[in-house]
Amino acid sequence: MPRDYAKIGKRSRTKGSNWERTLANILKAIWPEAKRGIGQSRWGGEVPDVDGTPYWVEAKVGVQPNMRGAMRQAEEAADGRPCIAVVKDNSVNNTPADVWVVMRFDTFVQLVLAESSDIGGLDT
């Protein structure tokens, strides 16, 4: 039986859109202005997948999604904000999905330094 690539593509886009909405709702607890960046569906690459945060957020979902590819995509489209990729790995064995945050090391260091200044410095 031939594969219906149009249906597969639509299902994949729907899964991605659902993850973007879910992620935006999760991030609202931290950044109340967080919302799905719907601009990419009209103009392509103009807004992050989740907007209203201090980061350019790229959201990816699938079975073993490409984390480096997600970061590369974010960095190519970013507007100067630090980039993060929030990657949801759907398991094929119906186990709970893994969610990862991928960022450059310098972004991580900036985040830790900002946090440490909020709590009185790092104890090393």
Describe each PLM feature range.
Residues 1-124:
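Catalytic phosphate/metal-binding cores of nucleic-acid and nucleotide-processing enzymes, i.e., regions
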